[in-house]
Structure formats: C-alpha cells, structure tokens
Amino acid sequence: MRRFPWAFGIGLVVALAGCGKQDGASSGGSREVVVYTALDRSFSEPILDEFTRQTGIAVRAQYDTESTKSVGLANRIRAERERPRCDVHWNNEIINTLQLKAEGLYDVCDPPEAKNYPDAWRDPDGMWYGFAARARVIIVNTDLVPDEAFPTSIHDLADPRWKGRTGIAKPLFGTTVSHVACLFASLGDDAAMAYLDSLKANDVQVHGGNKGCATSVANGATAFALTDTDDAIIELESGKPVRIVYPDAAEDGIGTLFLPNTLAIVKNAPHRKEAELLVNYLLSAEVEAKLAACPSAQIPLNRSAEPNPRVKGPSQVKAMQADFAAAAEAFPRAREVVEARFLK
C-alpha cells in the first residue's frame, strides 16, 4: 500500500511558509485547502479558522445544508470526480463515506495523529478516519415517563404502552438511516425488517430530523424518541424535563451505536500537502476537546483526549460493535425497506 509522507507538527508548516511556492499554491504564493464539511457551520468554521491562524493556510469551506443532510456534498464529490475541487471531505456520518470509498473517490493517507485512535475508528486501508462521535440515544420526558417505566432499548419505541407517543427521525437521511443500515448488518435483514414493522405498528411519530425528535420530547408532545446526543444535550442543558438513555447498554444488549464524523482526502486532491496537514490537525486531541466543549458535545475518540463529562463515550458505556463496511453494503436494501414502510 502506498503511504504518503507527512510533515510532523503545525509549527513546521509555519516555518516553511516563506520557503518558496508549495504544491497547490496560487501564483501569488498563498496556500489554501478546500474542505467539504457536513458538520454544522457554527461548529466547524471556528475550528477551520483556527487552523488558518496556526498555519497561514487559507481554508475554503463548502458547508452542507440541513435539507440535504450529508448527501449533498457526497453527491458533489461524485459529480466532480473527473476534476476534483475538494481536498478534504469532513463528513458528519460514516455510511456515505464508505460508499465514496467503494466508488474509488478517496486516496490513502497516513496522518501521524491516527496512531492515537482505536482500530474501530480507522479504515484498515487508510482511506478514512473517524473522530468526534455522536451516540444514538433515547431522549425521555421525565414529566411523562416515570422512572420505573424508562426505556432501556430501542425496542421500547414499539412498546404498546406508548403507542403513538414515541418518535424517530425520518429514516432516509443522516444518522437515522445509518442506524437502520447498522441494524441490518448486525441483526440480519429479517430481524431489522421486523423491528421497523413493529415501529410502524406502534404508530411511531416520524419527525423531519433528530432535532425535531428532541424538541418534541422536550415540549411534551412525545414521551420519548430516538435521536443523537448533540440534539438531546441541547434540550437537557436548556433545563427541559428530559433525560438521556444510552439504549441496549446492558450486558446482554447489542450496545449503544456511536457514529463518528469522518475525514478523507479526495483522490487527486488539488492541494494534497495542505490536505494532509488539515486532516492531521482535525484528528488532534486539541480539536476533539473543542468539539466536545461546543453545544453539540461531540464525543472524543482520540485516546489522548479527555472524556467529555457531558455525555458518555464508547469507553464508558457498552458500544454496539458495528460493522460499518457491512452496513454500507446493506444500505441500499435498508433504504428500500424504509421507503416501503414509511413513505407509503
């Protein structure tokens, strides 16, 4: 496998800034890197601005929109495959990342910071790296659900006691469809389809997104719902009557699903050296700490980073042993089943 050399440390970049034109530099001598990021602009932009302050490398960022979730930027990378404009793809989930890898749209990279990540969050072929995760959790309204009736599993959304009073995000985009694909890979098609059928039979409320799930529970319109930690923590920390449950974390459970942000360098990236430096910077414990401290409370995966005290990570709660590659393969089947059950 071909590996690429890396410059160790941001300081080296600054030291070399005046040493003549670098690869990817414009005729004026400035250096830049193009990143497509699906993480909310309010969270990702300050991180990218800090990279520029430390290195002098200008970051040209293309941000995703809420309406297209992470799919819009993935499709843009596909459309530009003959003449790539993007250097670094910063995705906020993993299934589209694996699909782009399978389509040959990423290149191998070997950032020094990757050694601080467990194997579960690194592509064995060196084409993507996971960091700054979210957990798939159940947000519960404590005014509506007594302690003794608290859900402990994603299967509790299909409990007849709560018919019509539980919720999920529309399972066609983002982390929700990624979760469904992981269930197909982990449980098998039949069991995953049976689970989706049980949700539909229980009149689960389908919201436009995970934020809608969280606000519905916080406002008392729904008793409990499946969502992401970043949306749940906002309601919890704003003082709403809610608690966060990490589902299926008992010894005999399948575990709570953690879904990372991912980083990859696009094949034939125009600014390869700058892309390598940006990826290594984003994987640093410093960046994970900043993302953990922001309102979305991202979960650090770098072993050198301190755990986020606001939410639990995979070292603190039983984590689902998700086979993301198998989930990506199952995705087309999962989406077909979802469309048949929730769009008709």
What are the residue ranges of the model-derived segments?
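Early extracytoplasmic/lumenal segment of secretory-pathway proteins
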Residues: C19-L98
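Short beta-strand->loop
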Residues: Y36-L39, Y63, P124-W128, V140-D143, ...
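A structural signal for short loop-to-beta-strand junctions that line the ligand-binding cleft
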Residues: P84-H89, D107-I138, H155, R165-I168
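Ligand-binding "clamshell"
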Residues: L100-V108, D119-G126, E235-D248
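Periplasmic-binding protein-like
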Residues: A133-R134, Y195-K200, V206-H207, K240-R272
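A bilobed periplasmic-binding-protein/Venus flytrap-type ligand-binding module shared by bacterial periplasmic
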Residues: V137-L144, A181, A185, F258-H271, ...
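Ligand-binding pocket segment of bilobal, Venus flytrap-like solute-binding proteins
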Residues: P171, T175-S178, C182-P247
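Mature extracytoplasmic/periplasmic domains
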Residues: N261-A322
